[in-house]
Amino acid sequence: MARERRDSKAATFFCLAWALCLALPGYPQHVSGREDRADWTQEKYSHRPTILNATCILQVTSQTNVSRMWQNDLHPILIERYPGSPGSYAVRQHIKHRLQGLQAGWLVEEDTFQSHTPYGYRTFSNIISTLNPLAKRHLVIACHYDSKYFPPQLDGKVFVGATDSAVPCAMMLELARSLDRPLSFLKQSSLPPKADLSLKLIFFDGEEAFVRWSPSDSLYGSRSLAQKMASTPHPPGARNTYQIRGIDLFVLLDLIGARNPVFPVYFLNTARWFGRLEAIERNLNDLGLLNNYSSERQYFRSNLRRHPVEDDHIPFLRRGVPILHLIPSPFPRVWHTMEDNEENLDKPTIDNLSKILQVFVLEYLNLG
């Protein structure tokens, strides 16, 4: 961002309920194209979600638990974690451990590299977690896990970046945990279109500037990974297509966790996907699934347009990747201050946004 500026019985019930969701009629299902269909890299532009019915929505949202997320994922991330710090290593190990322990069988990789910074060469490590590496197309959900570097303070305080971006990291881990069974179902599917489309979670290092935001002092992790993906053949063995062409939609989360956020539209070419978030928010409210919520303060507002903000999506945008940027406008009042901490987070808002995001992901992956 341009920033100076439960048990086995319960498990069986869930599986049966999910099978019922998949069997229920009355909702449009994704129809696979001809076997000789055109270039697969173009399918993202005509992709249609499978709209979840009320039964499925109720089942999905019953699996998420914001208090468990708070304890198991948010607290371990709410530490100083600028690139190269002990906290950065600890958070990176936590993210990998949580993802590797899931039944879906994620491929979790570290993308480690060195880059020149105002403080000399530093080592950075992105975390890329892929549900099915053999799938041609991937929905990408991303955030950054580093915190902005602040010199030692006289009062001993450290910057933990609660909204920036500990909460998005925790939300992504909770998404993977709470959707573990449907995502396992997706991975085991061998028939198109499900076998052709999967999910990728990316946790970027080095989003923040060390000194002053500039093209060379910012977005270290995303710049490196975008370049790498643009030159890595995909699917394996391909000669003319690369990993970056396999990104269907790049959903970037940032500055999330404060009360009453407003998310505007930043990119018109992905406005239809923003519209799905808006519709899901409305549906969840109608079902009574949003806490401490007023429709007068809705989160996603398709009638609001804002100029793009520099963030980890930029290196991908420049390579033609469709972007859905979920960053509030205005920024939280605690942005880049020591007050961006746990005390200033709003748990109901985070819970609500987690539910919306999880439904969105299932719809996009045609798991409904």
UniProtKB/Swiss-Prot annotation:
Reported tissue expression: Expressed by the venom gland.
InterPro entries found in the cross-reference section: M28_QC, Peptidase_M28, QC/QCL
BP-aspect Gene Ontology terms: peptidyl-pyroglutamic acid biosynthetic process, using glutaminyl-peptide cyclotransferase
GO MF terms held by the record: glutaminyl-peptide cyclotransferase activity; zinc ion binding
Taxonomic placement: Eukaryota, Metazoa, Chordata, Craniata, Vertebrata
Binding site for Zn(2+): D164, E208, H336
Gene3D superfamilies for the chain: Zn peptidases
Disulfide links within the chain: C143-C169
Function: Responsible for the biosynthesis of pyroglutamyl peptides. Has a bias against acidic and tryptophan residues adjacent to the N-terminal glutaminyl residue and a lack of importance of chain length after the second residue. Also catalyzes N-terminal pyroglutamate formation.
Transmembrane segments: none
Sugar-bearing residue positions: N53, N65, N292, N352
Signal peptide as annotated in the record: 1-23
Gene Ontology CC annotations of this record: extracellular region
Catalytic activity reported: N-terminal L-glutaminyl-[peptide] = N-terminal 5-oxo-L-prolyl-[peptide] + NH4(+)
Keywords: Acyltransferase, Disulfide bond, Glycoprotein, Metal-binding, Secreted, Signal, Transferase, Zinc
Residues the record marks as active site: E207 (proton acceptor), D254 (proton acceptor)
Stated name of the protein: Glutaminyl-peptide cyclotransferase
Enzyme Commission no: 2.3.2.5
Enzyme class per UniProt: transferase
Location of this chain's protein in the cell: Secreted
Membership in a protein family: Belongs to the glutaminyl-peptide cyclotransferase family.
